[in-house]
Amino acid sequence: MRLLVKAPAKINLSLDVLHKRPDGYHEVKMVMTTIDLADRIELIPQMDDTIQIISKNRFVPDDHRNLAYQAAKLLKDTFAIKQGIAISITKNIPVAAGLAGGSSDAAATLRGLNKLWNLGLTLDELAELGAKIGSDVSFCVYGGTAIATGRGEKITPIPAPPPCWVILAKPSIGVSTAEVYRNLKVDEIPHPDVDGMVEAIYRQDYAAICKLVGNVLEEVTLKKYPEVAHIKEQMKRFGADAVLMSGSGPTVFGLVQHDSRLQRIYNGLRGFCDQVFAVRILGERHSLD
């Protein structure tokens, strides 16, 4: 029996870094939401006791560096699973883009193998396992919209924002998340109002949400990568209601409610940026069905 699982991308509507922890991680407070740009994960049982990664994307590692591989290995080791698995990954989410593509692939693998191998784990249990793989994996196990705290693994679900378009643009550069965090001086920069964002979402106040978007990591990435700053400026100029970098970058997203304006922004960005997507926010959390 083969199993297909969707692995949607995420954006950060608000991302704050509070301080560096004794364990080397950073304490964060974020509002994240899934969007309907998704990788496609196909899980194919194997006769031998191996884990294989299959992908046509040359940027996807096919060994232990791949987070989906790590997810499968974690379940095999934890529950003494002797069956092998091939994980076919069709990438639609740009790689190393600040959209949690790798983390979402891992989360989809956890959810899918939980079903395929009849493990009977809850989403909470899968999210706890996911935290061992990466900071964004726990959120990606649940999906929907949530506050993430700790190093990103403590998840509190909240309602989805009001319906709107999300336009994404990724320049053809890579950004090292570790390097961005290394260069972040949390005591010397302005911090976004994460609680205000949460309140605005509960009120379904689109205008307030647009005013409150914020990402503390922009302080590092925009200075080092002028291409990202340029996309932000152009997206604003083309008429997006709010513009923000997602994660550590380099992807920039804009929020917009009107179809005509969306088309104008999309066409304008396509003039100088190869990877541009127009998507919607996914309001629903994942289920175990």
From Swiss-Prot:
Catalytic activity: 4-CDP-2-C-methyl-D-erythritol + ATP = 4-CDP-2-C-methyl-D-erythritol 2-phosphate + ADP + H(+)
Catalytic residues identified in the record: 10, 136
Pfam family, any one: GHMP_kinases_N
Main EC class the enzyme belongs to: transferase
EC number(s) per entry: 2.7.1.148
Family matches, as Gene3D superfamilies: 3.30.230.10, GHMP kinase, C-terminal domain (3.30.70.890)
InterPro entries: GHMP_kinase_C_dom, GHMP_kinase_C_sf, GHMP_kinase_N_dom, IspE, Ribosomal_Su5_D2-typ_SF, Ribsml_uS5_D2-typ_fold_subgr
Residues that coordinate or bind ATP: 94-104
Alphabetical keyword list: ATP-binding, Isoprene biosynthesis, Kinase, Nucleotide-binding, Transferase
UniProt entry tagged with the keyword ATP-binding: yes
Biological-process GO terms, alphabetical: isopentenyl diphosphate biosynthetic process, methylerythritol 4-phosphate pathway; terpenoid biosynthetic process
UniProt key word Ribosomal protein: no
Pathway: Isoprenoid biosynthesis; isopentenyl diphosphate biosynthesis via DXP pathway; isopentenyl diphosphate from 1-deoxy-D-xylulose 5-phosphate: step 3/6
Gene Ontology MF terms: 4-(cytidine 5'-diphospho)-2-C-methyl-D-erythritol kinase activity; ATP binding
Superkingdom of source: Bacteria
Function as written in the Swiss-Prot or TrEMBL entry: Catalyzes the phosphorylation of the position 2 hydroxy group of 4-diphosphocytidyl-2C-methyl-D-erythritol.
Annotated NCBIfam families: ispE, PRK14608.1
Family per similarity comment: Belongs to the GHMP kinase family. IspE subfamily.
Name assigned to this protein: 4-diphosphocytidyl-2-C-methyl-D-erythritol kinase
Species: Geobacillus sp. (strain WCH70)
